Amino acid sequence: MFKKVSKNANRLSRHQRVRNKITGTPERPRLNVYRSLTNIYVQLIDDVAGKTLVAASSLDKEIKDQVSATGNAEAAKLVGQLVGKRALEKGIDTVTFDRGGNIYHGRIQALAEGAREAGLKF
């Protein structure tokens, strides 16, 4: 008999499997994405030093002023552009994309496209 496993449990197991394979370095940090129901958060993380190099979210004033709702693909694309701009200011142009176990679709895809438009390579 099959057991029903929640979507979140599946996402967490995907995330653990991916995190065992990728790490962020100072030259190529990990672009980590956390998606909640109402917002999206992004960090560039150096796993060697355990430091967050750059962060952006849909709660930033620059994003909130431009969009009416923060939990949609439009806001995610703006967050991607913002994190890309901040990363380039710090001299970071290549990253490793960690989608946090989420499927590459919708808000996650929009965020990645926005970061690529801003100049990040992954």
From Swiss-Prot:
Task: State one Pfam family annotation.
Answer: Ribosomal_L18p
Name the keywords, alphabetized. Answer: Ribonucleoprotein, Ribosomal protein, RNA-binding, rRNA-binding
Gene Ontology CC terms, in alphabetical order: cytosolic large ribosomal subunit
Signal peptide span per the entry?
none
Name one molecular function that GO assigns to this entry: 5S rRNA binding
Residues of the region (Disordered) are 1-20
The protein's matches in InterPro entries, at most eight in alphabetical order, are given as: Ribosomal_uL18_bac-type, Ribosomal_uL18_bac/euk
Report the record's Gene Ontology biological process terms: translation
Q: How does it assemble?
A: Part of the 50S ribosomal subunit; part of the 5S rRNA/L5/L18/L25 subcomplex. Contacts the 5S and 23S rRNAs.
What this protein is reported to do is described as:
This is one of the proteins that bind and probably mediate the attachment of the 5S RNA into the large ribosomal subunit, where it forms part of the central protuberance.
NCBIfam families cross-referenced by the UniProt entry: L18_bact (TIGR00060)
What family classification does the UniProt entry report for this protein?
Answer: Belongs to the universal ribosomal protein uL18 family.
- Stated name of the protein: Large ribosomal subunit protein uL18
What taxonomic lineage is listed for the species of origin?
Answer: Bacteria, Bacillati, Bacillota, Clostridia, Peptostreptococcales
